Every structure is written in C-alpha cells, then in structure tokens.
C-alpha cells in the first residue's frame, strides 16, 4: 500500500438560513457553501493491524478519538474490516474553532485517502453517505467547490464555480463561539418564524433568502454574488460579540464587495475581485486593528474539495 498526501480546503458559508426544526433535534437549513484555497495538508500512511495513530502540529488539536479525522478512520475500518491501520499526520493551516470546517475537512481527507489507499473505488455518493455519519459539513468538504446544502447540510447540489473571487478572513485567536450555543440561542429568540410543516418548509426553500444569491451564482456574477450574502446566526452572535461586528463594519468601510460572518463564527470575511484588492483590505484591517490576537488571512475561492497531492 502507498502513502497518500491530500489537500483539505476550508469552507465558508455564503448563505445560512434557518427555516425550521427537525425531528432529530437539528435545524432545517438552507446554505450555500464555498471552498477556499486555505487548506490543511493530511498525510496517510498504512499501518499493520487495525491501529489508528494521529499526529498534528497544532498543540490545541486533540490527537485521540475525539478528533473527527480519527473517527473517520475508525468508521472506514468498521465498514471495510481487515484493510489495515493508518497513521494520519495533519499539517494544520486552517485556524481552529473558527467556523471554517477545519476538522470536517481533515475527516473528509481521511475518507478520500482511505478509499484510495485501500482500493475501494467508492463513488462520491458513497463517500457522502459515510461523511454524513460523521458530521453535517463533511459531505460538502469531500466534494467542495460551490454548493447548495439543505437538511442539516448533507443534501448537496453542486453550483457553478465562483473561483474568481478572493476572501480576506479575520478572526481573534482567543475568541470562539460554540456552535450549539448559537443555534440554541437562535431557536430561543426566533423559533416563532420557523416553518412548521413540509409544505411550509418547501416554500421557504424555494422563496427564501437564497433566491437572489442562487440566481447570481448561476450567472457566475462576481459583483452580484457578494450583495446577497446572508447569515441568520449573525442575529445572535454579533450582539454578543461586538468585536465581530466591528470587523464586519471595517470591511464594509474598506469597500469589500460583501462581508459576513461565516457559519456560527467568529470568522468574518470580506470579498474582493482581485488579489491586490484583497491584500489592500487585509493591510487596512491590520492598521485599523493592530491587535496581535487578530489573525488575518487572504485566500481565494476554489472549485474543488479534497485534492490528491501525492
């Protein structure tokens, strides 16, 4: 068996609309997800027996069974017994606790890598099925690009690529927002707006905030797409964390094509149509907020998910 090295891109949400509750306790969502070039590098090496060993260069990333990458390897061993063990090495580039799906991307890389290493020949639909057992973002991280995501996020429809856009990502390293808290607080404050039956849910899917954004994406209109960014979770996170609102306001004042908090945060992104404009915006933000705790990264939209490097 060969070793494999894979690129695992981060993702941002261009749209996150909460439209109702699900029987499983999760929310019914309408999302548009987007891969970016910022990525972890995940290396897989075969091991004898059924050992799973995990290594990461970031001290705050757990290397035990709580890590999604470890759980992905265990799931694959359970589904395909006797294929052997694996050593997983993660070179962490995606900020942790940032709402950028770094852990989900690593798990997706393990699924794709073990499919290759073990010669399973799984289809993308089969990979998505296993990914959905692990987490809502992981099916998207497998295939990446630009996609409409429904349900918990596992029902994916590919959309035209938007890889001409750049994003400046900004996050205070010491700030984290617990995703369960964000959704629970939203439910407490806004559940009266939820769709209550299948017909109402379908109507919200067809006629909600995604309509204009999906139309702009269908035309690959890089000027209009940023005008239709939308995230329901901003309603609960921004009042609680004014420093996130401040970054958003600054991106607007610097002339970003669009700006929004990604997912449950706390990362905020500002969009530009060229690298030079994105880098200027990053410099302006650094000057306005010269705080060493603030991490600022310039990246580009990309059109694929997990990529084989070697």
Curated annotation (Swiss-Prot):
E.C. designation(s): 2.7.1.148
Domain of life: Bacteria
Keywords, ordered alphabetically: ATP-binding, Isoprene biosynthesis, Kinase, Nucleotide-binding, Transferase
Catalytic residues (UniProt): 11, 137
Catalysed reaction equations from the record: 4-CDP-2-C-methyl-D-erythritol + ATP = 4-CDP-2-C-methyl-D-erythritol 2-phosphate + ADP + H(+)
Family per similarity comment: Belongs to the GHMP kinase family. IspE subfamily.
Protein known as: 4-diphosphocytidyl-2-C-methyl-D-erythritol kinase
Organism (species): Acaryochloris marina (strain MBIC 11017)
